Each structure stands twice: as C-alpha cells, then as structure tokens.
Regions:
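Alpha-helical DNA-contacting segments of helix-turn-helix folds
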Residues: 59-66
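Amphipathic alpha-helical packing segments from all-alpha helical-bundle domains
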Residues: 75, 94-97, 113-140, 151
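C-terminal peripheral helix-coil segments that are non-catalytic and often amphipathic
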Residues: 83-91, 128, 132, 136, ...
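Hydrophobic/aromatic-rich alpha-helical bundle segments in the mid-to-C-terminal region
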Residues: 116-120, 138-184
C-alpha cells in the first residue's frame, strides 16, 4: 500500500468534508449515503472509509470546522470592535452552505444519541467561546458590563438562531441584517 503524505491526507479529508456538506445540504443528513459522498469526491467507498468510518464521523468533523471560526473569536478578532466582529459573524452565517444542515442536525439530535452528543459539544464550545470573547470586550470597555457575559452569550446565540431561521425561510437578507445590527446594538451597548 502506498504511503499517504500528511498534506495529501488533509487535502483529501477537506474534499470529502466539502462534498459531504453539499450532499447533506441537498438531500438531508439522513437520506445521504457514504456512496453518494464518495461519488461526489470521485473516490471509492473504500477510500472514503479510510478517512471516515461513518456519516456521523464526517458530521463531527464538519461541526468542528464550522465551530473553529467562533472558537477562535477572541484570538482572530482581538483588535476589532465587537460590533464589527458580530457583523462578520452575520456574514459568515449568510454565506454558509450548511445553514439548512444546521437545523436538520438539531432536529436529528432528538432521535440520534451520537448526533445529540456532537451537537451538544458543539453548542457548549461555541457558547463558551462567545462568552470569553464578550468578557474580553467588557474588560476593554467596548460593551456594557452590567450584564453577565454568559447571559449576553445566551441572548446573542438565541438571536443568531432566530436570524438563521429568518434567512432559511426566505426573509429578505437586507432586512434581516438591519434587524441583526439593531438587536446586537440594543443588547450590548
């Protein structure tokens, strides 16, 4: 068996993940198959299984990559104003190819313990990262500090979910963006 160089392995994994996002978004997680993902990437099913043992494993990797932007919030946007960062989060959300997938995964969590665990870990890590970012912003004096950062993170997460819902059901993205900005300002200033 030929040796696979680490760089190639990462490229191959990334291609699989991107294909899985497309397939999951088009067909839904439950109806998607490993065969379809392999076909989309242009590899054999056996090759696919050398990288990922199941759809749940691919999903976990997708979730970890999607979370990375939020998990690195404090580090990535250290010198930015809080409102700029939250505006960037909005733009990341509307440009996400997996917006509908996110809602499907949340729904699947009630029936699949593996997916529930992945989703719960993802949610908790995003919330913790957002809380840390908000605490840092409070210490800098860029946002109000009379409300606990954990509560602010919960409120912003709920707002984010509502905005995602509005976009998913087809409400005009410019109107949604305006409401996002006004809501974030009302919550944080």
């Amino acid at each position: 068996m030929p040796k696979v160089v680490p760089e190639y392995k990462e490229i191959a994994k990334n291609k699989i993940i991107q294909a899985a996002i497309r397939i999951f978004s088009q067909k839904g997680f439950h109806k998607s198959t490993m065969d379809e993902i392999a076909r989309e990437v242009g590899v054999s099913k056996g090759t696919l299984y050398t990288y990922f043992k199941s759809k749940e494993e691919i999903l976990k990797e997708i979730w970890e990559l999607n979370n990375q932007n939020i998990l690195d919030l404090k580090k990535t946007f250290k010198e930015y104003d809080c409102s700029e960062v939250l505006d960037e989060l909005y733009h990341m959300m509307i440009n996400s190819s997996g917006l509908n997938l996110s809602f499907e995964i949340t729904a699947l969590s009630s029936h699949n313990d593996n997916i529930k665990k992945i989703n719960k870990e993802s949610y908790e890590s995003k919330l913790e990262s957002l809380k840390d970012f908000l605490q840092d912003q409070q210490e800098k004096g860029t946002i109000k500090n009379d409300t606990d950062a954990d509560i602010l993170a919960q409120i912003l997460t709920a707002l984010y979910t509502d905005v995602a819902t509005q976009l998913l059901i087809g409400i005009d993205s410019k109107k949604v963006h305006e409401k996002w900005i006004k809501s974030v300002t009302a919550i944080l200033k």
